[in-house]
A protein has these predicted regions:
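Peri-catalytic and regulatory segments of divalent metal-dependent proteins
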Residues: 3-126, 180-181, 201-203
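Metalloprotease/metallohydrolase-associated module, dominated by Zn2+-dependent proteases
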Residues: 140-187
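Charged, low-complexity, helix-prone segments enriched in Lys/Glu/Asp/Gln
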Residues: 16, 45, 120-125, 151-154, ...
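Extracytoplasmic/secreted envelope proteins and their assembly/folding machinery
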Residues: 31, 35-42, 89-90, 99, ...
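Post-HEXXH active-site segment of zinc metalloproteases
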Residues: 9, 118-148, 189-192
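Residue-level signal for pocket-adjacent positions within structured domains
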Residues: 88, 157, 198
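Long, well-structured alpha-helical subdomains associated
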Residues: 163, 181-223
């Protein structure tokens, strides 16, 4: 178990963008919902992590990123010792309309760690750089700076190549975590449908909202 803390390290991760929605909670209600979600989600996520990935550090720390002017965002990262960190910006805590929403986002971020997405994403970046950098050489890009530029592009494409898959994996496992902690994942997943739908852009990093909803519905129906 853990207590919400404060983190001030910047992260270069995609932000969730808010949309206008009714029934915004008071600050007091939002903070209370966050604390309840931490108390119930963290033990479930830790237990599942230890069952599925016994070699991983499963001691989740859930923190508040209170730096000013932050967007609505939540992210999962690792501290220097490999401890999994789940961070919420203050605007995200305020944006969630109920306990199910804040809990589902928390479960989704915990799922990224349990599924090993950081390591897998890094591996994809390396593979993408090698493939596209190699192709540039084969196809006649003999200038070294051109090949280096192609390699950088390849790393970016490789890092994104499974990001949609990772998000759907996190939605699926997050659904199980949220439900096991006593929350309604279908109600919680509504948070994602107040943000712009990315559709099916080639280099988009998040799946279409319809795909995400179908994933949550499918997993929830089997619980």
């Amino acid at each position: 178990a853990c207590t919400p803390a404060i983190v001030d390290q910047p992260r270069d991760l995609p932000a969730l963008q808010p949309t206008v929605a009714p029934q915004q909670l008071s600050q007091r209600q939002a903070i209370e919902n966050f604390k309840i979600a931490v108390a119930r989600i963290e033990p479930v996520a830790e237990q599942l992590c230890r069952q599925r990935s016994p070699s991983q550090n499963c001691d989740f720390q859930i923190v508040v990123d209170d730096r000013p002017n932050q967007p609505v965002n939540a992210y999962q990262t690792l501290d220097p010792n490999g401890r999994p960190i789940i961070a919420f910006t203050v605007p995200l805590i305020a944006e969630a309309r109920n306990r199910d929403e804040i809990a589902f986002v928390m479960a989704h971020e915990a799922a990224h760690h349990i599924e090993g997405h950081i390591a897998r994403q890094q591996n994809n970046a390396v593979v993408g750089a090698l493939l596209i950098g190699g192709l540039a050489g084969v196809l006649g890009a003999t200038d070294q700076s051109t090949i280096e530029a192609a390699t950088r592009i390849g790393a970016g494409v490789g890092a994104r190549s499974y990001s949609k898959e990772f998000e759907l994996e996190a939605d699926a496992l997050g659904t199980r975590i949220a439900a096991s902690a006593g929350f309604d994942p279908l109600n919680g997943a509504q948070f994602f449908f107040r943000i712009p739908d990315p559709g099916d852009r080639f280099l988009g990093t998040h799946p279409a909202n319809g795909d995400r909803l179908r994933t949550v519905q499918r997993v929830a129906a089997g619980l």
